[in-house]
């Protein structure tokens, strides 16, 4: 979070729990904030939530730990709940002065407050005219068709369009502890035991040195005492000395060994440091492998889905959430002799129940018909097919498809109209896998540490430019005039870039559940991971492309085309067919336009253990020089993008 410290803007560091708790507590104490003030504060709140989500997504689970993951998710939930509470309080303050903001023509109050993240539409029914049943907000086609009972009641209609989704429950982003690679935990135990053994050996050496010092000093004292004795005891002393020669030699030998102790300990320290470094590197490698394998693994079983429940593994919510509410109109301000009086109710903003839970009407459906709603679809979201409308079930904490009827979508005007049995949060969904499987793909170098990934689907062709550790949407081709101007040309790190594309409706990133909804060319996870690693390593100088023969080989092998990227010619004969099994790479004798698949080795070529060693057989010195000068962050970014798109399994 070095960038955070450089800003010095007084905002809390989302990675520090104490700062987040202080920020939330101080904001809770602020009261009577207007809607404009809440919207302004929400910019910081949404930024903190986004940073917390990025921490959870970008940081390896072994570095965060379950406690830290729970802490960050708790901070996200608290911020979301507090922001919702602040919006309700600000809405109540606005509705209290509805009479002073009333329109001169209709006599009712209408208010629109807009921001890049939030748009508020509020209509207060002050006149209660039974013939005034069509509510359209000025300058828009957004509005409601309300029944007579609402047209004659003290109610207000609120449409709060948030371009973020704080309704859908957070899904865990960390890998559960039991799914981590066992070898990682084993190596941690080995490292601890090695450090313990080294420290024990040092302690024994120190203890041995101390005992040697004591023995030498004792011998010197004895010799001095013997020289001071009388001459008549000389023979006896001589005999005593002869009898003590062996222990003396042992003591001297121990003293000499003691002099060598520092040298031996220094060597042991060096060996221990080298062993520790090797262990750390191995642990890091295993942790990275576990994280990469997690990106390409497939869940064995789908969770149970209730009737009319939206399967969020199959569909994605897009365009934010439309919070539709019928509110009880609060007491209005009353000017009295220069004073303004208002009744303050402690229960706060109240929802108006529609239809009521208990009714004596013989035909409730005719007395309380559905409410017609017209909404505008977010212009920064692409729907490749007509969107579906779903509603939030607050009691069950899930999205549902029932209670919605007569859906009409106007693609040209980007308007969607539907009937809703009861108002509440609604959103639009699209099939998550609408652009899967891919029709083709290509990874092409643009220079050292620069590549272009092209993915062609049924509905679109998009190009992703990767430079060093940053990604950018270079172009996107669509059937209509829609385009993602807010994303094109904007450089982002891989994880935020993937999030931005998903939120825009352009999803080419499979999940662990995607194989249930897409016909995939499933490959062995480790083979797929190793292939992406090798492709990323060579991507500065070599181009890779989709091959139809990848469907013909078994799951333990992948087939794709390769050529040196320095060659400017576009002839098809420059592309070679390559087959890789994770531990063996070979060029195939067949070509892309051959009629029958064969694993026969190409003439005058050899088997190799990696793609790197294989391409060295035909690559130019300039190409291999580019590979050697590739930046590690660039290689990691390309590898992460390939692992996220999974071109070998979903093409």
List each model region and its residues.
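Noncatalytic interaction/regulatory regions of large eukaryotic proteins
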Residues: 1-383, 404-409, 414-415, 419-651
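Short beta-strand elements bearing conserved aromatic residues within extracellular beta-rich modules
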Residues: 387-388
